[in-house]
C-alpha cells in the first residue's frame, strides 16, 4: 500500500508538535507558551531550601588552586595549625547502619596488632608495630650481602598477628554513644587544606578495622579487607560551605551543599556547647563496606542502575558525630602540614607518609580461607592511607572511571534516592532519573517518562549530566 505525501507531512507535523511540547515543558521559559505548565507544588519548598539549580557555578568564576600554587598573597587560611570554626559547624554527621558489625576505631590502637611485611611475606622490621612512629616512608633493612640499605614502604603490608578470619575482638571497633554521637576511642582524622582564592577543603577521614564486603545472590561476603579508610570532603568558599563529596568504593558522589539533608545540633565552640542551633549535613554509611551515600535504602555497588544484586544498604542507624573527637592537621602555603594540637604533635607526621597498605595482603588462591566468585575474591588487599586519597585535587572527585575521559565531576542538585523497601519516598529526593523530570509538566507526562526511562541508559545519562 502506498502512503501519500500528505500522510507523511501530517506525521512530521505531529512529531514536530510533540517534540516542541516536550522541550517547552522542560525549559525554564515554558510558561510563556503554556502558563499552566509551571504549576509546581514543590516550588515554595525549593525556594525555602535556597536551591538555584540553573545558577552559575562559583567554581567556574573563582576556581580553587592546587596546594602547590597557593602563596601568601592568595591563601585562604590565615593561621597554620588552627581549624576554622566554620569547618566544625559544617562537619558531616554519619548514620552508621543499624546492624553494623564493624565500627570505627583509633588508628593508634589498630597498628599494635600488626607486623610489617613486604609483598613476598618477608619482615621489614623484626618486632610487631608498637605505635604510629613505626610507620615510615622508608626503612633501613639488612641486605643479603650483609650491608644495610634504604627501602620504600611502597608495596609493604600491615600483616595481622592474629588470624583475622576468626574475627578477633579488635576488628569490631567502637560504637557511638547514644544521644551525643561521641566515640571516645575512635577519633576521626581531619585535614584542612588551603586551596587559595577563598577556597578551603575540609577532608574528614573515618577509620574502621575491617571492611565486610557485599553479598551476591546470597553468596559472600566478597571483597573483605582488614583496615578501611573512608572520607568526605566539604568544600568552602570564603567560609561558606558550597559542596560535599563522599567516598564509596574508590569513587564517590558530589553534591551541592544545600542539597544534602541536614539535622539540627547545638553549636560547639572550642569543644563547649552553646545555646545556638545550627544545621549539620548527614551522610549514610553502608553496612559493612562503610561506603557513603546521601540517602537511605539499597544502592547499586559501583555498577549504576544495572546490577542491583551487588548492593550496599543504608539506614538511620546509630548517629556518629566525628567533630566530637578527631586528630587535625592543616595544609597551607608550600604544602606544609601542621598538627593542630598536642596529641597530633606527639604522634608526628611520619605515619602519614607510610606508602604501604593498612591491612593484610590479599590471600593467595591456595589459602583455605580464600574463596573466589566470578566478580571478586573473598579477601583482598588493605587500603592506602589518607595522603594517598588525592587531597590536592582541584576537582571534587577523587578519581575518574575509565570511561570518564573528559574528567567530569558534576555536583548533584538533588539527593540520589536509594532503592528497595527501606528507601524513603519523597518527591524532593532524586529518583535516579535526573532533575529534568521534575521540570516536566503536566504530571501525567512526567509519570510516563519516569516509566519509560526507569533503570535504563537514558536514566544514567540524565542523572550524570543534570544531577
Curated annotation (Swiss-Prot):
GO CC term, one of those recorded: endoplasmic reticulum
Subcellular localization(s) per the UniProt record: Membrane
TM spans (from-to): 17-37
Superkingdom of the source species: Eukaryota
Repeat listed as a keyword: no
Record-stated family: Belongs to the VPS62 family.
Miscellaneous section: Present with 623 molecules/cell in log phase SD medium.
Function, as annotated: Involved in vacuolar protein sorting.
Protein name per the record: Vacuolar protein sorting-associated protein 62
Source organism per UniProt: Saccharomyces cerevisiae (strain ATCC 204508 / S288c)
Amino acid at each position: 500500500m502506498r502512503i501519500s505525501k500528505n500522510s507523511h507531512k501530517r506525521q512530521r507535523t505531529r512529531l514536530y508538535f510533540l517534540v516542541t511540547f516536550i522541550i517547552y515543558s522542560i525549559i525554564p521559559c515554558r510558561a510563556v507558551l503554556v502558563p499552566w505548565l509551571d504549576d509546581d507544588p514543590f516550588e515554595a519548598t525549593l525556594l525555602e531550601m535556597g536551591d538555584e539549580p540553573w545558577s552559575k557555578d562559583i567554581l567556574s568564576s573563582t576556581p580553587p588552586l592546587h596546594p602547590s600554587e597557593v602563596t601568601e598573597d592568595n591563601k585562604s587560611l590565615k593561621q597554620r595549625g588552627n581549624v576554622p570554626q566554620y569547618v566544625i559547624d559544617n562537619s558531616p554527621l554519619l548514620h552508621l547502619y543499624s546492624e553494623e558489625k564493624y565500627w570505627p576505631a583509633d588508628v593508634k590502637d589498630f597498628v599494635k596488632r600488626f607486623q610489617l611485611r613486604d609483598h613476598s611475606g618477608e619482615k621489614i622490621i623484626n618486632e610487631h608495630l608498637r605505635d604510629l612512629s613505626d610507620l615510615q616512608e622508608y626503612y633501613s633493612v639488612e641486605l643479603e650481602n650483609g650491608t644495610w640499605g634504604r627501602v620504600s614502604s611502597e608495596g609493604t603490608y600491615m600483616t595481622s598477628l592474629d588470624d583475622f578470619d576468626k574475627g578477633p575482638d579488635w576488628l569490631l571497633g567502637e560504637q557511638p554513644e547514644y544521644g551525643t554521637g561521641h566515640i571516645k576511642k575512635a577519633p576521626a582524622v581531619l585535614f584542612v587544606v588551603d586551596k587559595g582564592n577563598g577556597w578551603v577543603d575540609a577532608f574528614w577521614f573515618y577509620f574502621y578495622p575491617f571492611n565486610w564486603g557485599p553479598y551476591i545472590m546470597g553468596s559472600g561476603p566478597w571483597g573483605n579487607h582488614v583496615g578501611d579508610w573512608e572520607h568526605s570532603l566539604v568544600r568552602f568558599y570564603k567560609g561558606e560551605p558550597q559542596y560535599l563529596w563522599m567516598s564509596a568504593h574508590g569513587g564517590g558522589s558530589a553534591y551541592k551543599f544545600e542539597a544534602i539533608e541536614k539535622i539540627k545540633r547545638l553549636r560547639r565552640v572550642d569543644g563547649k556547647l552553646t545555646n545556638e542551633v545550627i544545621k549539620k549535613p548527614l551522610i549514610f554509611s553502608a553496612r559493612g563496606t562503610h561506603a557513603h551515600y546521601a540517602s537511605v535504602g539499597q544502592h547499586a555497588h559501583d555498577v549504576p542502575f544495572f546490577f542491583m544484586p551487588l548492593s550496599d544498604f543504608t539506614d538511620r542507624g546509630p548517629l556518629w558525630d566525628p567533630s566530637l573527637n578527631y586528630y587535625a592537621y592543616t595544609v597551607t602555603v608550600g604544602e606544609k602540614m601542621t598538627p593542630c594540637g598536642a596529641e597530633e604533635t606527639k604522634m608526628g607526621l611520619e605515619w602519614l607518609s607510610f606508602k604501604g597498605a593498612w591491612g593484610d595482603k590479599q590471600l593467595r588462591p591456595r589459602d583455605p580461607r580464600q574463596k573466589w566468585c566470578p566478580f571478586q575474591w573473598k579477601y583482598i588487599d588493605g587500603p592506602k592511607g589518607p595522603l594517598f586519597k588525592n587531597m590536592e585535587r582541584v576537582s571534587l572527585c577523587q578519581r575518574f572511571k575509565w570511561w570518564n575521559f573528559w574528567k567530569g565531576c558534576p555536583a548533584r542538585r538533588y539527593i540520589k534516592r536509594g532503592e528497595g523497601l527501606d528507601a524513603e519516598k519523597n518527591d524532593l529526593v532524586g529518583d535516579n532519573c535526573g532533575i529534568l523530570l521534575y521540570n516536566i509538566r503536566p504530571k501525567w507526562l512526567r509519570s510516563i517518562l519516569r516509566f519509560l526511562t526507569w533503570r535504563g541508559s537514558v536514566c544514567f545519562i540524565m542523572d550524570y549530566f543534570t544531577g
